Amino acid sequence: MSITFGELVGNFILVTGSVIVLLLLIKKFAWGAIESILQTRSQQISRDIDQAEQSRLSAQQLEAKSQANLDASRSQASKIISDAKEIGQLQGDKLVAEATDEAKRLKEKALTDIEQSKSDAISAVKTEMSDLTVLLAKKIMGANLDKTAQSQLIDSYLDDLGEA
């Protein structure tokens, strides 16, 4: 089966005419609806893009605000920690100073007590010595002793001093 040139041209004209008629019918009856659908879809896509952009900007602002809050929180935490360290150091220094002052006070009191005890002991020894001296003088005055008796009395006195 072979197709002639005339048949080929006839088919071409028929198909071309059919396509043109079809396009005219589509333009008259369906093109408005198709164009409306395409316009609506285009507007929807445009709104979606705008909303996505707004969401992105909002997310960026929220991220920036969150980062600022996080930085502020970190700064506050660092300040709280440094303040706590400083307060701890000050309290430690205060306790050390108080302990040092207390130790000095106790040392001074102990030295004062030692001096008082020493003074009391010296006073007691002096009183004892004076009492013994008076006693010895009474014994010497009460008896006219010769040199050996005096020597024995002095030795006895010295022995009494050694025991006291």
Curated annotation (Swiss-Prot):
Positions of transmembrane segments: 6-26
Cellular compartment(s): Cell membrane
Membrane-related topology note: Single-pass membrane protein
InterPro entries: ATP_synth_B-like_membr_sf (IPR028987), ATP_synth_b/b'su_bac/chlpt (IPR002146), ATP_synth_F0_bsu_bac (IPR005864), ATP_synthase_B_chain (IPR050059)
GO molecular function, one term: proton-transporting ATPase activity, rotational mechanism
GO cellular component, one term: proton-transporting ATP synthase complex
Assigned keywords, A-Z: ATP synthesis, Cell membrane, CF(0), Hydrogen ion transport, Ion transport, Membrane, Transmembrane, Transmembrane helix, Transport
Domain of life: Bacteria
Family recorded in the similarity comment: Belongs to the ATPase B chain family.
Biological role: F(1)F(0) ATP synthase produces ATP from ADP in the presence of a proton or sodium gradient. F-type ATPases consist of two structural domains, F(1) containing the extramembraneous catalytic core and F(0) containing the membrane proton channel, linked together by a central stalk and a peripheral stalk. During catalysis, ATP synthesis in the catalytic domain of F(1) is coupled via a rotary mechanism of the central stalk subunits to proton translocation.
Subunit structure: F-type ATPases have 2 components, F(1) - the catalytic core - and F(0) - the membrane proton channel. F(1) has five subunits: alpha(3), beta(3), gamma(1), delta(1), epsilon(1). F(0) has three main subunits: a(1), b(2) and c(10-14). The alpha and beta chains form an alternating ring which encloses part of the gamma chain. F(1) is attached to F(0) by a central stalk formed by the gamma and epsilon chains, while a peripheral stalk is formed by the delta and b chains.
Protein name: ATP synthase subunit b
Organism the protein comes from: Streptococcus pyogenes serotype M3 (strain ATCC BAA-595 / MGAS315)
